[in-house]
Swiss-Prot record:
PROSITE patterns: KH_TYPE_1 (PS50084), S1 (PS50126). Residues 623-691 form the S1 motif domain. GO terms for molecular function: 3'-5'-RNA exonuclease activity; magnesium ion binding; polyribonucleotide nucleotidyltransferase activity; RNA binding. This is Polyribonucleotide nucleotidyltransferase. Pfam families: KH_1, PNPase, RNase_PH, RNase_PH_C, S1.
Length: 712
């Protein structure tokens, strides 16, 4: 292998993608700099020399954002990047998921893959550059990675699929799909869509896979040129004699324990068998390594039997058929002071979702590498330990919780009404109260119920379902509504959310090399049947969104003003708008186009604030008549307040029909008089007249008198 800098290029969606090796981060096992347009990502892969004493594969994937990549200095006192953003966490998960299945079973060396985003071109995805870079860093290293993999973003504009759409194209696209895989199969899908049919989503996935094959061929050329020879690594294996002895002792009882239908009773039965076997070996005073192997063998016995029951006998751990959904129960409005709430229960999985409506000023402000600056719809997911009957410290959300929250948000966002139709910020919080699999999809169902209870005029209700797969050779079984054991011991977790019309979100993780088109197609169609079944249940509880908002939700009124008048409403240093807020207790949000949103729980105060703003921006027209209060008296005339913030002058000569010697002879401060606008001068000063109206009144009276005399 050469240590000199080498450069490789390929065209990707009309923009050049370049890979540089041999110059940067040479002490890592593998490192590449990927340039895609003006986006630049450094990806590295390192591994420990010795295996770790753990019972899992210790892989860590980090996608690191640097604000210098978009020419920003971090805010706050410290002025450096802190904890990863939500976008960075989601990107890390996106890269981890297609990579993880491609390490040999039993590989226990610690592996860390790091991608640092160094420059960002918004039209050239840094996530896709990082995914390709991560795959390449592993592939050219001596780490025994069974890749490469590649990813592609797919959009659809006017019925045509587009690879790696630009920011402008994404705004027009009704599909936002990220697909990853090997040259032979798909092994990761992440998608949002605007109620798109399953057949179209499948076509989009396969369209993306065609591009993946091309990118993998490109990587294979690079590996051929600069790749290191793979290290010989000893994989974790259990002792053959010990394996046979444990199986003879445990298999029969374990097979019976696994067929207990109820989750906790089944777990207790399995743990009882495990306890008996482990106590047998502890009595022989064997070392920790032997006990570790015993636990590994017991785990494999459970896994093999669960998979055999599903694929051979077509029996699921809880006794259901392959396409059967667990019992459903739903309720809305169970929290009286919240704006909306929905409780969704599916078997032993339960989620309580709460909807809170806020003013547009409550949007989430985003400060990251993307073009999006704010977000008016949010979904947050919490998974407390009591939901699985365990204890652990209560800390902030982890990667999994952030990922599940984002999946729910993506599934629901296509049906959220526009800001014009529903000028509210919407925040959903899903509290998982019980967990036995598919909690992310339960949170989607609960959130739909909560929004309907809150009176959010959804375009359509959304439900979600998690599909599973157990595959042995060419034989496979697809499972609807998987529970925890099926997720843990199966080969696939394929989450599908959508309306009756089509898909709004997909997420697929697998533990095998990949899936064929046929399996994907069957899983999507089976998911549709299950989704419609769940939707029908939800609609039996609340058929449509409530027509009225909660009494505790803010009332919002919208008005439009001349954009040139915005500064008048705000006032110097915000003095005017703060005065309105202090006087009425409302929230006021003003858009650049002159749209004003006024919100509070008190409609009377909303109306009062609106009247004040109308008076501030109101334009005085010549010929208009006002009833105003005398605010100030001078020798030359009286100043009259026409409406809030607007005065005019009635010159002494315009106060009365007769000659006035002294202003105070006609009006005093505080008097309310009727005046007419007779002139607005070049400086915007308003001249008023009382005399004109008196004269007009006098003429009307004279005309009446004349008509009366003619009739006599």
């Amino acid at each position: 292998m050469s240590q000199e800098k080498q450069v490789f290029s390929i065209d990707l969606a009309g923009r050049q993608l370049t890979v540089e090796t041999g110059q940067l981060a040479k002490q890592a096992n593998g490192a590449v700099l990927v340039r895609y347009g003006d986006t630049a990502v450094l990806s590295t892969a390192t591994a420990s020399k010795e295996a770790k004493n753990v019972d899992f594969f210790p892989l860590t994937v980090n996608y690191e954002e640097r604000l210098y990549a978009v020419g920003k200095i971090p805010g706050g006192f410290i002025k450096r990047e802190g904890r990863p953003s939500e976008k960075a966490i989601l990107a890390s998960r996106l890269i981890d998921r297609p990579i993880r299945p491609l390490f040999a079973d039993g590989f226990r060396n610690e592996v860390q893959v790091v991608s640092i985003v160094m420059s960002v071109d918004q039209d050239c995805s840094s996530e896709m550059a990082a995914m390709l870079g991560s795959s390449l860093a592993l592939s050219i290293s001596d780490i025994p990675f069974e890749g490469p993999i590649a990813g592609a973003t797919v959009g659809r504009i006017n019925g045509e699929f587009v690879i790696n759409p630009t920011v402008e194209q994404q705004e027009q696209s009704d599909i936002h799909l990220v697909v990853a895989g090997t040259k032979d199969a798909i092994n990761m899908v992440e998608a949002g869509a605007d109620q798109v049919p399953e057949e179209t989503m499948l076509e989009a996935i396969m369209f993306g896979h065609d591009e993946i094959k091309r990118l993998i061929a490109f990587q294979e050329e690079i590996v051929q040129a600069v790749g290191k020879e793979k290290s010989e690594v000893k994989l974790y294996e259990v002792d053959a004699d010990l394996n046979q002895a444990v199986r003879e002792m445990a298999e029969e009882d374990m097979h019976s324990a696994i067929q207990v239908h109820e989750k906790h009773a089944r777990e207790d039965a399995i743990n009882e068998v495990k306890k008996r076997v482990i106590e047998h070996y502890e009595a022989q005073e064997v070392d920790a390594d032997i006990l570790g192997q015993v636990n590994e063998i017991l785990y494999k016995i459970v896994k093999e039997e669960v998979r055999r029951l599903i694929t051979v006998e077509k029996i699921r751990p809880d006794g259901r058929k392959g396409d059967e959904i667990r019992p459903l129960a739903s309720e809305v409005g169970i929290l009286s002071r919240t704006h909306g709430s929905g409780l969704f229960t599916r078997g032993q999985t339960q989620a309580l979702s709460i909807c809170t409506l806020g003013a547009l000023g409550d949007v989430q402000i985003l400060d990251g590498l993307g073009v999006e600056e704010s977000k008016r719809f949010m979904h947050h997911y919490n998974f407390p330990s009591f939901s699985v009957g365990e204890t652990r410290p209560m800390r902030g959300p982890g990667r999994r919780e952030i990922g599940h929250g984002a999946l729910g948000e993506r599934a629901l966002e296509p049906v959220i009404p526009s800001e014009k139709d529903f000028p509210y910020t919407v925040r959903l919080v899903s509290e998982v109260l019980e967990s036995n699999g598919s909690t992310s999809q339960a949170s989607i169902c609960g959130s739909t119920l909560a929004m309907m209870d809150a009176g959010v005029p959804l375009k359509a209700p959304v439900a979600g379902i998690a599909m599973g797969l157990v595959k042995t050779g060419e034989h496979y079984t697809i499972l609807s509504d998987i529970q925890g054991m099926e997720d843990h011991l199966g080969d696939m977790d394929f989450k599908v959310a959508g309306t009756a019309q089509g898909v709004t979100a997909l997420q697929m993780d697998i533990k095998i090399d990949g899936l064929s088109r046929e399996i994907l197609e069957e899983a999507l169609q089976q998911a549709k049947v299950g989704r419609v079944h769940i939707l029908n249940h939800m609609l039996s509880v609340i058929p449509e969104p409530r027509t009225e908002l909660s009494a505790y939700a803010p009332k919002i009124i919208t008005m439009t003003i001349n954009p040139d008048k915005i500064r008048d409403v705000i006032g110097p240093s915000g003095k005017q708008i703060n005065k309105i807020i202090e006087e009425t207790g409302v929230k006021i949000d003003i858009e650049q186009d002159g749209t004003v949103f006024i919100s509070s729980i008190n409609q009377e105060m909303n109306d009062k604030a609106k009247k004040i703003i109308e008076d501030i921006v109101r334009e005085v027209q010549v010929g208009e008549i006002y009833e105003g209060k005398v605010k100030r008296v001078e020798k030359f005339g009286a100043f009259v307040e026409l409406f809030s913030g607007k005065d005019g002058l009635v010159h002494i000569s315009e106060l009365a029909l007769e000659r006035v010697g002294k202003v105070e002879d006609v009006v005093k401060i505080g008097d309310v008089i009727t005046v007419k606008v007779i002139e607005i001068d070049k400086q915007g000063r308003v001249n008023l007249s009382r005399k004109v109206l008196l004269k007009e009144e006098q003429e009307k009276e004279a005309a009446k008198e004349e008509n009366k005399q003619e009739q006599q």
